[in-house]
Amino acid sequence: MTKKLVTEEMRKQWLPVLQKESEAIQPLSAENVTIRLMQNQAEWNAKNLGESDAPGSVNSTVGKWQPVLIDMAKRLAPINIAMDFFGVQPLSGPDGQIFALRARQGVGDGSTTAQARKELFMNEADSGYSGDGTVQAGDPSGFSQAEIEGSGSVVTTIGKGMPSTDAELLGTTTNPWARVGITVQKATVTAKSRGLYADYSHELRQDMMAIHGEDVDNILSDVMVTEIQAEMNREFIRTMNFSAVRFKKFGTNGVVDIAQDISGRWALEKWKFLTFMLEVEANGIGVDTRRGKGNRVLCSPNVASALAMSGMLDYAPVLQENTKLAVDPTGQTFAGVLSNGMRVYVDPYAVAEYITLAYKGATALDAGIFFAPYVPLEMYRTQGETTFSPRMAFKTRYGICANPFVQIPANQDPQVYVTADGIAQDSNPYFRKGLIKSLF
């Protein structure tokens, strides 16, 4: 009698495991990020504003800045472009640390230092490393040179599992184990500041209240906070475009000429081809990072219009996003979703026609650049030493740095403390950029 491959006892034992749904990864959502920011704001308010309760029933008519600042911090968080393109990691202090855990081959590869050992999970896996030791050569998919190019004699090698006779000798001097290990490397992110100042006369305050019924304090507060946020958005857009690598599959040196590099009789056909171009370059981001394909698009208004006119852009989600405060009419704007699922944002100040692709994963740890807000808003109030005119200032503190796998080179000594932010031109594989010529 032959032994059953699967018995009823096996089924009873493992069926609950098979039927149990895997728990979904809970990312650090935009709501959680905003909660951390408001907590930082509340802690700063308590330590620095110096607002105390007035005696008795006077409390009900005394205006305070604490709820105003918290409300401003809540309002600013959703319209920050970093929430859509960057990983967001709020700081709980002026300095923070980010870590990169790198898996590497062991000493068996002949290297003498940890940082010189070949890194795992970054390129194609060496199919012979844990097996028969065959050195990989040829095409990574297994095709010969003749099959790909039509001629040639190069044949692709295939690493296989080792035979039992070799496996029985693992650990001996003639047949050592293939070894792997890890290195943990760290970098720092330091909060930097922005600040604006304004003063006004008592006469202006009195006249604005008497004639227009407006509080100058509130008006100037909105002006300064909105300007700071607008400047931050422009910093993030410029940083993203500065550090993105250039298109690799289309165009020349990151410049795509619609008239020469894209085939099509009519402008509409060429505009439709833009989506395929985006898809190919987005796949390239996935190959370079091993994290995922590009899923965000930042482009000039005319490029977005070309995609819309070709029927590739669905504008319906814009109305839904309005209710989630995902649209910033004074900075970047959410335009819609492409037919391949990419979310499209418009750079309203763009002069050159361009497209920048970005990858952002499901969690705040999975992105090419990290935005690290510390104190959303710091407010200072005083009076002129001779004029006694009211003065007001706002500051914000935040840090920005590249993903540690980008800013820490593969051959960096694990014992060396990295203090640079990793923002360098044409260096971040989580982003790809291309200039578009002859769009119309």
From Swiss-Prot:
InterPro entries, sorted: Gp23/Gp24_T4-like
Localization terms from the record: Virion
Keywords: Capsid protein, Late protein, Virion
Highest rank taxon of the organism: Viruses
Principal location class: virion
Family matches, as Gene3D superfamilies: 3.30.2320.40
GO cellular component, one term: viral capsid
UniProt entry tagged with the keyword Endoplasmic reticulum: no
Record's function text: Major capsid protein that self-associates to form the icosahedral capsid.
Annotated family: Belongs to the T4 phage major capsid protein family.
Name this protein carries in UniProt: Major capsid protein
Organism: Salmonella phage ViI
